[in-house]
């Protein structure tokens, strides 16, 4: 049913391909554009390039050996997320540029997102509960799960919107109760909550898709995808119908179950649960529609491939010009929905890009290029490298290759199954197979995928996948914290053997694209500073004190205080950058009553910052943003979830956050925690390990606006050593090199370099207000 091919060339009548996994004497012919069989892939076939990899699915072979597939999947090793693909199907059309548009739209109205998260929590409670859950207790759990999000939500500060929100929460709770207790048991539904799996993930190499379901029966006979928003109330008068993007999502899950898990779609009952009504809607499969959807997927992947291959500002600009109301409005809508809601959301991005200066546009396109190339390489591996790299190594690399690199632990047996613990579900696994010649490349806090592996053919592409993090690891045992609790012990059979591998997540890339969005909306003052269009400013009143400073650490602190925009501290290892210089700056800014944000690249470095903060006397109050498993146990009392635990109202959360003037975390964590900046504005950010942080990784934080419209971060201090530990980049130096003369003129020579390095090169003179180099020994 499935064949992996490499495209050689096309002609009017056929594609000519070679098998990837076998030897052929001559190219095979593939018939395409066949009405009612595969003509939906006409646009895909027009985009193919020499050596493009394609999967052919449901292939018929005629007497002449000509292949006629029902599905043509382009570059299947590049996995698209099912929900992201489904969201490209909008009321106004399904142009692939919707995928790029979504990247550049930071979530601003958090109320619908919050309601969705809380509804998911309600579903978990109703599935796990042996007796009837209490609504108020569930809302308390929701508050403990999302304290910052609830406290920062602007809509909830409006009395009427607040009333509506909590009325909606109660309505969704009651509707989920009705669905689970009544509809599940109704004739024809065949849903059994005692034999359910919550949040299983699937990786489907055949279709080039990945996704996570809300609810699945263990035997995969039926599944539920839950939606807290509105269905389509206008398509048919007096009738509620699923929205197209929701129908597409369900269709993709059905296809994944068929092509990854071997579950024929007509034997699976898929349901859309609209908790607003409630409506448990049986979704109807349409393989013709699926082909149209997969053609859109292919066009998105071709777009991504083209951007990373061309590596050209002009080409990227052309692709991004498709983000325009006239292009995306394929259905030529002209109604109120389009004019009032849809058009403005598209046009806002279009106009912001147009409003950039030529230099700013070049910078924007260069970073978009770079991020897209990094993402492509992280998914599919380097197209110029023969080894198995990137997320696709999960299914392309052999067991021997994975074992040699320490990238898999297998033959694991469950010794303790606490997956039903709804607060902190975990598994204790024993290593029954150890290879003394290789060291596992896993450590505490790592994100992993877990799956049953009882025979050599079992892998992430044909088994149900559970996501989690490593809580503890030793030579004999591994303790895994599961992302979702599983009340049903049969989901993870004791008699099975299991494997874990690294999880490859797009979160960091999503945050970098959000950083570009923040750049579009940044203050002109901050954009000019970052692009060297104005000089950094300083308070010259401290000149005398700086000249008379008793030692380097006093001088550093005074220079950091004098800087109005930024200050760079260059320090080789062992010079006391963290233990003395950073501490001295924190103490000085704290005495001045400043709001301080402390950042680093790694969690280990954040632990060191926490160690420094706890050594300050008198004691300072600080909050750490981050994961419990990535935090040293000594500093876990300072984690935000523990600090806010005594709070029972949004006002108490807001007051506790306002009282604390020092916040700590990794750049990656804070970049994804945008709601924090709706509650806090920081006078200064002190950023350690700055030479390990890529410019697009830091851009969003430096460009973000606070609630009043000014910069969310006032000035910033970058601490690092440009001669030590460069940032980790997947693409080669040649690929990340900047050719544009305008960008080279502001010191941007290569995007593998950090912002620290660029600003250091732009320093006015060796003895400057902008930076200071520590001597070799502290």
Q: Each predicted region: which residue ranges?
A:
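Conserved ASCE P-loop ATPase motor domains encompassing nucleic-acid-directed helicases/translocases
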Residues: 13-18, 22-45, 55-56, 376-529
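A non-catalytic, helix-rich entry segment at domain boundaries
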Residues: 122-198
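A helicase ATPase "motif cassette" and its flanking acidic/Ser/Thr-rich regulatory loops
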Residues: 1-5, 9-16, 116, 120, ...
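Pre-ATPase regulatory/linker segments immediately N-terminal to the P-loop/RecA-like helicase/translocase core
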Residues: 95-98, 273-279, 287-310, 439-558, ...
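Conserved Walker A/P-loop ATP-binding site and its immediately adjacent core
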Residues: 598-611
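Conserved helicase motor core of SF1/SF2 NTP-dependent helicases
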Residues: 591, 602-604, 617, 654, ...
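Conserved small/polar residues in nucleotide/adenosyl-binding loops
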Residues: 3-11, 769-778
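Mg2+/Mn2+-dependent nuclease catalytic core
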Residues: 17-49, 193-299
């Amino acid at each position: 049913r499935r064949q992996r091919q490499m495209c050689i060339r096309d002609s009017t009548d056929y594609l000519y391909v070679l098998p990837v996994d076998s030897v052929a004497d001559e190219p095979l012919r593939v018939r395409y554009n066949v009405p009612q069989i595969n003509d939906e892939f006409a646009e895909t076939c027009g985009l193919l390039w020499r050596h493009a990899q394609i999967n052919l699915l449901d292939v018929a072979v005629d007497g002449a050996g000509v292949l006629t597939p029902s599905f043509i999947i382009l570059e299947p090793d590049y996995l698209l997320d099912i929900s992201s693909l489904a969201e490209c199907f909008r009321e106004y059309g399904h142009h692939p540029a919707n995928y790029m548009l979504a990247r550049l739209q930071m979530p601003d109205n958090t109320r619908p997102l919050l309601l969705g998260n809380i509804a998911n929590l309600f579903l978990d409670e109703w599935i796990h509960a042996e007796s009837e859950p209490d609504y108020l207790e569930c809302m308390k759990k929701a508050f403990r799960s999302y304290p910052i999000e609830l406290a920062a939500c602007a809509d909830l500060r409006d009395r009427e919107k607040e009333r509506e929100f909590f009325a909606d929460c109660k309505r969704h709770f009651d509707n989920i109760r009705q669905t689970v207790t009544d509809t599940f048991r109704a004739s024809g539904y065949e849903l059994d909550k005692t034999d359910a799996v919550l949040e299983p993930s699937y990786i489907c190499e055949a279709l080039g898709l990945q996704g996570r379901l809300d609810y699945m029966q263990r035997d995969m006979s039926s599944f539920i995808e839950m939606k807290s928003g509105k269905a389509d109330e206008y398509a048919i008068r007096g009738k509620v119908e699923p929205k197209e993007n929701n129908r597409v999502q369900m269709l993709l899950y059905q296809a994944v179950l068929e092509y990854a898990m071997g579950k024929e779609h007509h034997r699976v009952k898929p349901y859309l649960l609209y908790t607003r009504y409630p409506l448990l809607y049986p979704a109807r499969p349409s393989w013709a529609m699926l082909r149209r959807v997969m053609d859109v997927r292919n066009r998105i992947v071709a777009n991504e491939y083209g951007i990373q291959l061309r590596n050209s500002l002009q080409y990227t600009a052309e692709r991004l010009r498709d983000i325009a109301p006239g292009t995306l409005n394929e259905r030529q809508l002209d109604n109120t929905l389009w004019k009032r809601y849809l058009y403005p959301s598209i046009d806002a991005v279009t106009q912001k890009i147009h409003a950039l200066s030529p230099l700013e546009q070049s910078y924007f396109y260069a970073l978009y290029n770079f991020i897209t190339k990094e993402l492509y390489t992280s998914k599919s591996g380097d197209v110029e490298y023969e080894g198995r790299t990137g997320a696709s190594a999960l299914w392309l690399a052999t067991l021997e290759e994975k074992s040699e690199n320490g990238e898999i632990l297998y033959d694991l047996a469950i010794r303790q199954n606490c997956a039903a613990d709804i607060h902190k579900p975990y598994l204790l696994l024993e290593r029954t197979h150890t290879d003394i010649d290789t060291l596992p490349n896993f450590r505490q806090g790592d994100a992993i995928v877990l799956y049953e592996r009882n025979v050599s053919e079992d892998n992430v592409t044909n088994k149900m996948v559970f996501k989690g993090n490593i809580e503890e690891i030793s030579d004999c045992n591994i303790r895994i914290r599961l992302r979702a609790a599983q009340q049903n012990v049969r989901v993870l059979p004791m008699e099975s053997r299991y494997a874990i591998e690294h999880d490859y997540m797009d979160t960091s890339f999503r945050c970098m694209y959000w950083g570009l969005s923040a750049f579009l909306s940044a203050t002109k003052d901050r954009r000019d500073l970052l692009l060297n269009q104005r000089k950094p400013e300083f308070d010259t009143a401290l000149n005398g004190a700086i000249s008379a400073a008793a030692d380097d650490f006093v001088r550093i602190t005074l220079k950091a205080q004098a800087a109005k925009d930024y200050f760079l501290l260059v320090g080789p290892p062992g010079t006391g950058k963290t233990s003395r210089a950073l501490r001295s700056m924190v103490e000085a800014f704290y005495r001045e009553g400043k709001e301080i944000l402390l950042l680093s690249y790694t969690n280990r470095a954040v632990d060191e910052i926490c160690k420094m903060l706890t050594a300050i006397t008198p004691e300072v109050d600080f909050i750490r943003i981050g994961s419990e498993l990535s935090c040293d146990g000594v500093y876990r009392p300072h984690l935000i979830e523990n600090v806010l635990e005594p709070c029972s109202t949004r006002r108490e959360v807001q007051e506790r956050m306002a009282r604390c003037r020092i916040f700590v975390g990794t750049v990656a964590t804070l970049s994804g925690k945008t709601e924090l900046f709706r509650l806090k504005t920081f006078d200064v950010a002190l950023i350690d390990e700055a030479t390990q942080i890529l410019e697009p990784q830091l851009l969003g934080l430096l460009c973000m606006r606070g609630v009043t419209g000014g910069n969310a971060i006032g000035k910033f201090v970058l601490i690092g050593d440009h001669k030590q530990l460069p940032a980790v980049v997947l693409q080669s130096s040649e690929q990340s090199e900047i050719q544009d003369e305008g960008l080279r003129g502001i010191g941007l020579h290569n995007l593998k370099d950090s912002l620290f390095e660029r600003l250091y090169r732009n320093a006015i003179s060796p003895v400057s207000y902008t930076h200071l180099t520590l001597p070799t020994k502290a």
